[in-house]
């Protein structure tokens, strides 16, 4: 629960700043004291809307059932629209008497509201397919042009119309005709029973010639459930794994499987997100995490693709094994990524060394998928929900 407690403090600080600016703003107007108090009270209610909800959610509720999680997400969105978006106008009004500068502040606030609404209504489900080519002299020639599709972070419990959204995602994925699909964790947001029968049927639509391989993410292992009496976290996770197996997915639990072409093979290794990773899942340094047993029986000469929900484990992985391609998710680019020229700017840059897209070191590659779903607020700005299609190329064959 540490993540949530930290987030509450960040949002509380933001609300206090917003309330302070609102208070200064109201002081600029001539009005009766009673009317001034009413305005300040109204703005205080708006500015503290999410804070009250968050504290009720995380501190008072016996459990974080899906409806409470949804209320929390939408309350945060309301806070951003009603409180944060107002602040450009407040600041310009306080620092200048020039009507043009104040007008620019008002326009900025209107633009921010528009961006937030567009991120919720449009970008949230505006799926993008990113094509990535990986060339290696370690790839067997029989796997030249092999196509791997990556999905990550569906967070089904937060979807507004999950059956419709998943059916659309499955249709896009199937049209790409992948040889294999890799799912890198966080299928659900809170618990396994988000997988209603209609949603299970929608997920079963996903098809790939060599099957679908998946791993568990932090939301999949039920770390956000408080009430463990009715159904323990272990049992929730067991049922989630059983559901994925029912779809025909192969859940990799710190193990390696092989895909064969003629006499050649490539290895698919999956790292299960564990309780021991929970407290450090947003840390940039996970050097203390021990993965020594992960590749103990995996031949180093075999081309290897490793699935890891959190990208921070890449350094641990590559120090142990000549892993050729590591696929990760988790970060979502914090659902905000603004493109400026050739650069993408995101708040996730403050927390993560590697946060989105392709990274390479000494012919080893890491790809961080921006995910499909969302957490904390129901919108995406710039960071569109992503489906990634990899095409593997044999360097020796290319010659």
Regions found by a protein language model. Name each.
Residues 141-399:
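Soluble catalytic domains of enzymes that build or remodel membrane lipids, polysaccharides, and related
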Residues 113-138, 158-160, 164:
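Hydrophobic alpha-helical transmembrane segments in integral membrane proteins
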Residues 88, 131-133, 389:
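Beta-strand secondary-structure signal
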Residues 1-125:
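Non-catalytic terminal accessory segments
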